[in-house]
């Protein structure tokens, strides 16, 4: 039997935990587990139910359910007045979070112990196998779990999430602490000591296995020389108490260090969406996907951002000055460093350390993990899961030739032949604007992405498909807002009249597109589009 705990451990109100509460409530129903959470969530359950949308089920990968289905889940609630009292005594939310991460709290420990005692009395023949905890657990709960000899499994989304376009959601989870590399480092050393005899997959293969459809064309520029020296990936909050209480480090330290070595023109910055919301800055002018931004710089630095994993995946230099993530011990500490993450570790981290969504909340899986399987056994179980779930070619287990494996992986995803050939050629002898690195085109309702090559200051989009076209919709910016105009379009070598699209117009994020008029096509469609781009700021300045 497992217990699932959902508590508010950040600078958010308790209501913000409602999504995780509902997700865990469903897992508890399906597995016969017990849930511990805030009293507030129980009191406001009807309101929470009313706010449920199909988007919630999609984002958190849950099946739809109604209140009647989960009413018999055994739940225990921490009184709101207790947290309110402790926070009032501390004087601020920051000091409260520091206290919860630094050490114990007698009042909370008494409540946690009382709940565990009640559970043990109610289930005398069912030992508590473990406690799942969303995000880093408070020290009072850790203290009580340790006294009762119950392991805590802390978990958080990794940088790879299926609702964001990746092929699987992977979780970072372990029996120790989420935001340090101690347990991961031990697992890595064990893995190295084992006779694994496993194939190593290249960066581009790993992207072909896990990556988004929209970013596959960017593989073609992975080996290109970046334009900038360093990217700074900002956190959602100015201070992260669970980090600062141990490392005494935050984003301000990163900016301070970067200013010593780099000019502003050598740096790029990407803020967390939570930070943008707090500053009332629209997310529309920030790309949903950061891959092109990552590729634009030689290295990336962060305090604690999971996005650092994407830098390693895209073969850029990840810099983590402090021990704040599971893989930080393998990252450079120096923001001027040139060392990339070794490929064998990247394979280990993706296939062995991170846990696929379908296994993350499986009691059978975690009971198996508690039998201390070898790291190689964990790696193989995860890899077998991906082969089945993602319909990967089993030849990737034995085929020694990397280009052959890579081509097979692309085919298994349903990539079109032109894209496969482009990526196999591995050419990158052209200029690119990382702000408009790729565009999307929909032909007969199916989306395709290609790079935009810069020639004489104009972006050129080219695609060849082995099918006739009944409809063509062109999304120049795709996942970011801005302004665009068409310079010229041809289909199968025949010019298309785009005079109506010759002026700059605003392109909303995601939905902004041109529906193109075109001549009838045969059994093959070749599309060439030349277009210009202006940021919203440039457009407004030009028309002010």
Can you say where each PLM-predicted feature lies in the sequence?
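Leloir-type glycosyltransferase catalytic cores
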Residues: 172-219, 330-429
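Extracellular carbohydrate recognition and processing domains
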Residues: 444-467, 501-512
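Catalytic donor nucleotide-activated moiety binding site of glycosyltransferases and closely related
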Residues: 84-102, 234, 252-287
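Donor nucleotide-activated moiety binding/catalytic core segment of transferases
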Residues: 111-115, 263-318
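Nucleotide-activated donor-dependent transferases that construct or modify glycoconjugates
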Residues: 1-12, 235
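Short beta-strand-plus-loop segments that form exposed binding edges in beta-rich domains
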Residues: 474-481, 533-534
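Active-site donor-nucleotide binding/catalytic segment of nucleotide-sugar enzymes
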Residues: 217-275, 351-352, 356, 364
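Active-site and donor-binding regions of nucleotide-sugar-utilizing enzymes
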Residues: 18-24, 64-181
